[in-house]
Amino acid sequence: LIWGSSPKTFSSIVGNWSIQLFDGRLIISGVTIVTVAACILIMVVLTLFTTKTRMGTAMRAVSEDKGAAGLMGINVNTTISVTFAIGSGLAAIAGVLLCSAYPTLMPTTGSMPGIKAFTAAVFGGIGSIPGAMIGGILLGVIEIFSKAYISTQLSDAIVFAVLIIVLLVKPDGLLGKHVSEKV
């Protein structure tokens, strides 16, 4: 709406450096290294925040049962606002990292990475921060192997087929815990 539909370029915040391993047979770009390090750091901080702080406990309580959390003295509206702010901040960080890896911006730039991020969260287990990260890594490995050994055009379909298989076999995801509701 503001910039129109023509592609825009985004300069990388990391620069254009890389590390070569195994006599140059494996080249890892600086963007990849920074992205992996940032994801690990964010996962650790978010896990500690949600398990060790009052606000994290409040967030988990509100996500479980809003009414009961309110009756226990938790300010539900504030907790939802903080959760939304954290999610927005994480989305902004993800957007910057994505644009550093793929510097040409179009209106549809984030659609497939967004779908794959949701797929990784479901694959790893909704509600499990480490599960989402492990799900993302496994989906990335599946996608790379399918591109290398099967077909580059079918890699997305293969990733989603694996998701369907996982949901049929283990509906809670790889690290999700099945919780039966008491009536």
Over which residues does each language-model region extend?
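Hydrophobic aliphatic residue packing
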Residues: 62-63, 74-79, 96, 119-122, ...
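Short loop segments and helix-boundary regions at transmembrane helix junctions
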Residues: 1-7, 49-56, 61, 111-126, ...
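Transmembrane helix-bundle core of multi-pass membrane transporters
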Residues: 1-52, 79, 145, 150, ...
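Hydrophobic/aromatic residues within transmembrane alpha-helices
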Residues: 68-69, 122, 138, 174
